C-alpha cells in the first residue's frame, strides 16, 4: 500500500477554503496520492468535492481517493477519482447488500478478526471491489 496524505472533508461541513489549503499544503509531502476522507456523496456536495479533486490533480496528486463510505450520486463517477463506497465494520459489511457500488469501487472494512481476514478479502473480491482495506482496527 502506498503513502497517502489525508484531508478530512467532514462530509461537506469543513469550509472549502480550508480543504483547498490543506490539499495544496500536503502536496509538498512525499506521497503516492491523497485520501479525501469523509467526503460527501450527495448531489449537494458534488461541487466542492469536484473542486478539491481538480486542485489535487493540479498540485501533483495523480491518485485521488474519495471516501464517502457509502454509494454516491452518479455525478461523482466523472471526477477522475477512485471512490470508496463502503467504510464500516465487519458485521455491517457482511450484512451490506452492495447496492449502489460499481465494479472497481473501494471497500474499507475494520473490526475484522485476524482469523476472518481472508474471508473478508474474498468477500471484497466477490463484490467486485477494485481496492480495499481489511483491518482489525479503524486507522483511517
Model-derived features with residue positions:
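Glycan-processing catalytic domains of CAZymes
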Residues: 1-140
